[in-house]
């Protein structure tokens, strides 16, 4: 076979050099991201805040808060890993606290509409995500409701087998409390995942 020679690149016929290149995404919509809600889990409070966006300036709506935090639930556990009875009692308490937020979520500020994205930067919830296998430093870091349910089932299995310890789970009352609160919140709010910041 003979050798081939490369010719210098020539402009395409019909496209003058000084005119802009055609734009191929005309008519495509660059939709803004969905409205976001920040979940804050503190020692003595759970709170939800609408995060500011271009269509939702800061202070446009009242937050939702309830006097139930990870420390509140950990104290109900006796500041140790829960027993079957203390877990059942805590589930009822947490349900009573998170269920009213469903009404708050169905009344978004003017100019917003579902779907919403739930975000959190709460350290204990980040720890729950890490135990579930979420890589926090690779965006988007998302913890699914199913992953939370799987962790909760492991915790439940552990406490229903006296003397058994799941060594992959942190053996701290506050971690178990945060897991329980997140599990009940995602379930009762109908949220499939939470983004971790």
Where are these regions (language model features)?
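N-terminal polybasic/positive-inside topogenic patches
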Residues: 12-22
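Beta-strand initiation motifs
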Residues: 56-64
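Helical "lid/coupling" subdomains associated with nucleotide-phosphate turnover
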Residues: 25-36, 65-197
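Short beta-strand scaffold segments in enzyme catalytic cores
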Residues: 46-52, 57
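Conserved catalytic-loop position in the HRD/HxD motif
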Residues: 40
């Amino acid at each position: 076979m003979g050798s081939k020679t490369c010719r210098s690149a020539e402009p395409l016929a019909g496209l003058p050099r000084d005119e802009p290149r055609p734009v191929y995404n005309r008519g495509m919509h660059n939709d803004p991201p969905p409205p976001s809600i920040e979940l804050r889990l503190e020692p003595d409070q759970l709170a939800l805040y609408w995060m500011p966006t271009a269509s939702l300036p800061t202070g446009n709506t009242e937050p939702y808060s309830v006097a139930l935090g990870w420390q509140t639930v950990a104290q109900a556990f006796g500041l140790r890993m829960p027993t079957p009875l203390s877990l059942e009692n805590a589930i009822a308490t947490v349900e009573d606290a998170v269920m009213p937020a469903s009404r708050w979520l169905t009344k978004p500020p003017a100019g917003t509409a579902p779907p919403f994205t739930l975000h959190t930067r709460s350290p204990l919830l980040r720890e729950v995500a890490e135990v579930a296998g979420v890589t926090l430093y690779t965006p988007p870091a998302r913890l699914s409701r199913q992953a939370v349910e799987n962790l909760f089932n492991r915790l439940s299995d552990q406490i229903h087998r006296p003397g058994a310890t799941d060594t992959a789970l942190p053996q701290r009352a506050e971690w178990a409390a945060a897991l329980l609160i997140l599990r009940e919140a995602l379930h009762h709010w109908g949220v499939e995942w939470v983004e971790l910041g």
